[in-house]
Amino acid sequence: MTKAPQLPDGLVVVVKSDCPTCVVVQPVIDRLGAHVVSEDDDAGLETSYLLDVDTVPTLIRVVDGVEVERTVGWRRPEWERISGTEGLGEDLPPYRPGCGARAVDPAFSSELAVRFGGSRMRSRRVELAELEDEMEALFDRGWTDGLPVVPPTEARVLRMLEGTTRSPDDVVAVVPPDLVECTVEKVAINAVLAGCKPEYLPVVLAAVEAACTDEFNMHGLLATTWFSGPLVVVNGPIAREIGMNSGINAMGQGNRANATIGRALQLVVRNVGGGRPGEVDRATLGNPGKYTFCFAEDEDGSPFPPLSTMHGLDAGADAVTLFAGAGVQGVVDQLSRTPESLALSLAAALRVVAHPKLAIAFDAMLVLSPEHGRVFREAEWDRDRLLAELGELLTLPGAEL
């Protein structure tokens, strides 16, 4: 880490021009003859960062080149005590809060951390030629899913890591098919590539952990010739906090969180684990959901408890559920007004998933639209009753299998 610059003995004030408090205390600063560090220029911004200033104005007293004490904002008693000068700013109120320092502004802090903070990222750096197009370079190196990605600069990755309290060196999972240890830092890099915001990172980390369990069997999902890929359903308050879509077009395009969280998972599997099409990924045709397939459950509008409660979690817990999804198959029933009738339509559609005679060879996730969900809510059917009804309707004679 770059050392803080040597400060002159006496009083030092860190300010910025667009802070109203800094403006009103300027006559006080002039009276004290303090050394001014302005965040408006690069040198001052560097000094502010290295002095760990988070609020301006910050008044610092320096003795023999060493900081002795400081105060932030405008507090007349504190300024008078530190400076040893009475009667400061008598035309000002005794107290006025300061402003957030530019050095801690997310627009600057990540770049400052790269330049002066002694960042110790472990991932290999890739240097590009001056005239090399960074977007094309990522395509050329095979680090994309076929769509453009966001170049993962060190500043962007550090900003992404601010979305979690976990250490960048923590191993999140061993990613198939190459069984490579994947750290929080590696997940963050791929989250940047995917276009995630830092607040999405906890969901991406959870999805990566879930995908790399033996129960989910990501290696098997890659190796199959079937259409399927990982589908992510998000439950809990975090879905709303990060702006996920659980309503109209929830499985489609248009929502950044839905699109980039699922994409980040796929990029981790591809770039860290080596799960690339034509290699271990043997899908004959694939499906568009292998770019990204992620949405939130509409917990408020659902006739049933959250999906996550089926796996032992309490309602209201933040959670991700993964499923090997092969694509979307619609169910049309605009006539049923009873749950029994609607269950018949659902069962008929479920029976033909993949092939009507292969009843136990394929799984399905049933996602109800609000209109169909309302039928079960008004009849007070719970999830268990619907599952039992579907089980009865899908029990077939052996001759039909």
Predicted regions and their residues:
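The canonical Cys-X-X-Cys-His
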Residues: 19-22, 59
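Structural motif
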Residues: 14-18, 41, 369
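Structural micro-motif
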Residues: 51-60
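Thiol-based oxidoreductase modules, predominantly thioredoxin-like and allied folds used
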Residues: 33-46, 55
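Iron-sulfur (Fe-S) cluster-binding modules
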Residues: 89-122, 129
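Non-transmembrane, aqueous-exposed alpha-helical and coiled segments at domain scale
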Residues: 113-401
